[in-house]
């Protein structure tokens, strides 16, 4: 059983509201959940404190036992400072030059080997 940390949609039409939940990968988006870890209200202002609320200790626990966050939740956790960012890949130019891909740190911009 693979466990994901993902968003479950609540609210009504044109007024979305999401819960950050732990659920089995094969369950439906709004289906059975193992645990609720917080909420996300996309219609609140960006600087509003009520936009995102997360239970940091429970998220750390689920990440430690192998739960995989979805891309959206992963970006939320990065902004909250819980996980490091994914390394970015820089691809060479298309002008016929030798193309080499290099990994770049998204925080410092340094090339990683």
From Swiss-Prot:
HAMAP family per record = Ribosomal_bS16 (MF_00385)
Per UniProt, subcellular location reads as:
Plastid, Chloroplast
Q: Does the keyword Transit peptide apply?
A: yes
Q: Which protein is depicted?
A: Small ribosomal subunit protein bS16cy
Cite the residue span of the transit peptide: 1-15
Where are the stretches annotated Disordered? Answer: 93-113
Q: Main subcellular localization, coarse class?
A: plastid
| Superkingdom of this protein's organism | Eukaryota
> Listed GO cellular component terms?
chloroplast; chloroplast envelope; plasma membrane; plastid; ribonucleoprotein complex; ribosome
Q: Cross-referenced Pfam families, in alphabetical order?
A: Ribosomal_S16
Compositional bias of kind Polar residues: 94-105
The family note in this entry says:
Belongs to the bacterial ribosomal protein bS16 family.
Observed phenotype of the null mutant: Embryo lethal, arresting development at the transition from the globular to the heart stage of embryonic development.
Give yes or no: UniProt keyword Protein biosynthesis: no
Record's keyword terms, sorted: Chloroplast, Plastid, Ribonucleoprotein, Ribosomal protein, Transit peptide
Gene designation per UniProt: RPS16-1
Q: Which organism is it from?
A: Arabidopsis thaliana
UniProt xrefs under InterPro entries: Ribosomal_bS16 (IPR000307), Ribosomal_bS16_dom_sf (IPR023803)
A GO term for molecular function: protein domain specific binding
């Amino acid at each position: 059983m693979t466990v994901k940390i993902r968003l479950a949609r609540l609210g009504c039409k044109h007024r979305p509201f999401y819960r950050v939940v732990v659920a089995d990968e094969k369950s439906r988006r709004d289906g059975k959940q193992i645990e609720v870890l917080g909420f996300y209200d996309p219609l609140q202002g960006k600087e509003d404190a009520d936009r995102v609320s997360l239970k940091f200790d429970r998220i750390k626990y689920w990440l430690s036992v192998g739960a995989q966050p979805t891309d959206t939740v992963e970006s939320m956790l990065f902004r909250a400072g819980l996980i490091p960012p994914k390394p970015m890949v820089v691809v060479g130019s298309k002008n016929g030059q030798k193309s080499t891909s290099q990994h770049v740190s998204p925080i410092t911009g340094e090339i990683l080997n």
